[in-house]
Regions:
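Structural signal for conserved beta-strand scaffold positions within catalytic alpha/beta enzyme cores
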Residues: 6, 38, 75-78, 155
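Short, solvent-exposed loop/turn segments at secondary-structure junctions
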Residues: 86, 114-116, 123
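N-terminal leader/capping segments at the start of a protein or of a new domain
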Residues: 1-71
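Short, conserved beta-strand element in jelly-roll/cupin
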Residues: 98-118
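Conserved metal-binding segment of the jelly-roll/cupin
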Residues: 127-147
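Conserved short histidine dyad/triad with adjacent acidic residue
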Residues: 76-100
Length: 188
C-alpha cells in the first residue's frame, strides 16, 4: 500500500507524518506541487512483455498525461530479478538531484520510493502498483528502488534524452531511511 512519511530535513529519525491514507497522501503532496493519483491496473504483464504491449494497455491514460503535460516521449523502465547489474542501476538514482523537466512515473508493478526535499522537509513517498506521481521540474529529490528491485513504470519526458539528472552534491540522501523502511511496518 502506498505510504507517505514526512520528516524535517534535519531530523531523519523523527517522522512528522506517517500515513497510508490515499486522500491524505494526495492532499499533502498537492500542497507542495506534486501530483499523486491512482489508476486501475488493467492487467498483469509477463516479465518479457514488450514496451508496446504495456503502452497499448494504458493508451488512454498515457494520452491524457501527455496532452496535459506536453510530454513528447514515453517509455517503460523495468527491473526484474533477472536484470543484470541491479546495484549499479539502484545507485544511479540514490543521490539528490533535480531535473529541468517534470519527473512523471506510473507504477505498473513493484514499488519504489521517491524522496522529495521541499521547504525544509523530506517527503518519503512509497509508490506501488497503480500509483502515478509527478514531481515538478527543479524539485530536489532522489529515488530508491530497493536492494532487491522489482518494478515496472511508465516514464513521461519532455525531451528525447530521457532521464537527465542535475546532481546537487548534497549528502542528505544517505542520512534518511532507505527503501526497506518505507515498505516495513505499517504507518500508524
Amino acid at each position: 500500500m502506498s505510504r507517505l512519511t514526512v520528516f524535517a530535513d534535519t531530523a531523519p529519525d523523527t517522522p512528522l507524518l506517517d500515513t497510508q491514507d490515499y486522500s491524505e497522501i494526495a492532499a499533502t503532496l498537492n500542497d507542495i506541487g506534486v501530483r499523486f493519483e491512482r489508476w486501475e491496473a488493467r492487467e498483469a504483464f509477463p516479465s518479457d512483455a514488450s514496451q508496446e504491449d504495456v503502452l497499448a494497455a494504458y493508451a488512454d491514460e498515457v494520452k491524457r498525461i501527455c496532452d496535459e503535460g506536453g510530454y513528447a516521449t514515453v517509455d517503460i523502465i523495468r527491473v526484474t530479478e533477472d536484470t543484470p547489474n541491479k546495484p549499479a542501476i539502484r545507485a544511479k538514482f540514490l543521490d539528490e538531484h533535480t531535473h529541468s523537466e517534470d519527473e512523471v512515473r506510473f507504477f505498473i508493478e513493484g514499488a519504489g520510493v521517491f524522496y522529495l526535499r521541499v521547504e525544509g522537509k523530506v517527503h518519503m513517498v512509497l509508490c506501488e502498483q497503480n500509483d502515478l506521481i509527478s514531481v515538478p521540474a527543479n524539485t530536489t529529490h532522489w529515488f530508491d528502488m530497493g536492494p532487491d528491485a522489482r518494478l515496472a513504470a511508465i516514464r513521461f519526458f519532455n525531451n528525447e534524452e530521457g532521464w537527465v539528472p542535475n546532481f546537487t552534491g548534497s549528502g542528505i540522501a544517505s542520512k534518511f531511511p532507505e527503501f526497506d523502511y518505507a515498505v516495513g511496518a505499517p504507518a500508524a
